[in-house]
A protein has these predicted regions:
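Conserved SGNH/GDSL esterase-like catalytic core that processes O-acyl groups on lipids
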Residues: 32-129
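Conserved catalytic region of serine esterases and O-acyltransferases that act on ester linkages
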Residues: 215, 219-222, 226-291
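Short, well-ordered coil/turn elements that cap or connect secondary structure elements
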Residues: 17, 44-46, 143, 190-191
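Bacterial Sec-dependent N-terminal signal peptides
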Residues: 1-16
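Conserved beta-strand elements of the Class I
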Residues: 21-23, 105
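Alpha-helical cap/lid subdomain in secreted, periplasmic
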Residues: 90-224, 237
């Protein structure tokens, strides 16, 4: 019978199709993750890929689930094929789901609540349910072959003053730890997820000494260099099932050393989820290898 409890750490690398097709259902955080750097990493590895992002800024699961139920023409559908991005406004979720035979479809919480599965912290209470369950049902009914992916974005930069950071007492380590906890709760409640993208770990790893707390462009969204590249590296490694370290693609103007740090931050996140890996020179030396 069908395996009902896939290991979220399962490496799907052996069964990948000739062209990997990835659809993210998300917001600006999925744009950060998949729209800029991911294609180049696959291309450098000689792997054909099509990448889609169903985008509404800041969109939480509740709104995605409502849009799925009403099939609202509410999305900007960004699609990268052959290295070129097209943007189609006023797209329905059903249209995007039917557009390709998607290999992977990711979902994520938005509006700053990705550290809350069914959680109360100080004055904030939030639940991803029943929205997450209902969204998964819609996706599975329309895309039976797709592997479901859960994306767990990163914590804000220390000192960020936006309202969403108040849900975490304006404390980066509180936010990071709550994202780790919420993600584990999601995966326990939903064994349907074949993979999870622990972007919070990759970003937090990269924040250790070499790059520092400079991964965002505004305290919240990833910057266009190290931020987006690091998370792109994580997605690449998780999907390919092989290490991103040594991939020849890096953004224009990025040094080889910086690229190696970003790749290593992502690789260590894949190897050690829900943990921060110190990438300082001393720590790497203690581990008897160069980062």
């Amino acid at each position: 019978g069908e395996q009902t409890n896939p290991d979220p750490e399962e490496k799907p690398g052996q069964t990948l199709p000739e062209t990997i097709k990835i659809l993210a259902i998300g917001n600006s955080f999925s744009a950060d993750a998949v729209e800029q750097e991911l294609y180049g990493l696959f291309e450098a590895a000689g792997q054909k890929v099509i990448i889609g992002n169903l985008y509404i800024g800041g969109c939480p699961l509740e709104k995605h689930a409502a849009n799925a139920a009403s099939d609202a023409a509410a999305y900007s559908y960004r699609k990268i094929s052959g290295g070129t991005m097209t943007k189609t406004p006023d797209t329905k979720m059903s249209q995007a789901l039917a557009d390709e035979d998607w290999t992977f479809i990711s979902v994520q919480e938005g509006a700053g609540y990705h550290g809350y599965y069914n959680t109360t912290y100080k004055n904030t209470t939030h639940s991803m349910e029943p929205a997450l369950t209902s969204l998964i049902k819609v996706i599975r009914s329309k895309c039976k072959n797709a592997k479901l992916v859960y994306h767990a974005p990163w914590a804000a930069k220390a000192g960020y003053t936006g309202k969403k950071f108040s849900f975490y007492d304006f404390d980066q380590s509180v936010m990071y730890n709550m994202i780790c906890t919420a993600t584990q709760e999601v995966l326990k409640a939903h064994p349907e997820f074949s993979l999870f993208m622990n972007s919070m770990d990759a970003v937090q790893n990269a924040r250790t000494p070499y790059i520092g707390d400079n991964m965002t462009r505004d305290g919240w969204h990833l910057n266009y260099t190290t931020g987006r590249y690091t998370v792109g590296c994580l997605w690449y490694e998780k999907i390919m099932g092989k290490s991103v370290v040594g991939n020849s693609y890096r953004p224009a103007g990025m040094s080889e050393t910086t690229a190696k740090v970003c790749q290593t931050a992502a690789h260590e996140a894949c190897e050690h989820p829900y943990a921060i890996t110190d990438l300082s020179y001393e720590a790497c030396r203690r581990r008897q290898r160069r980062c």
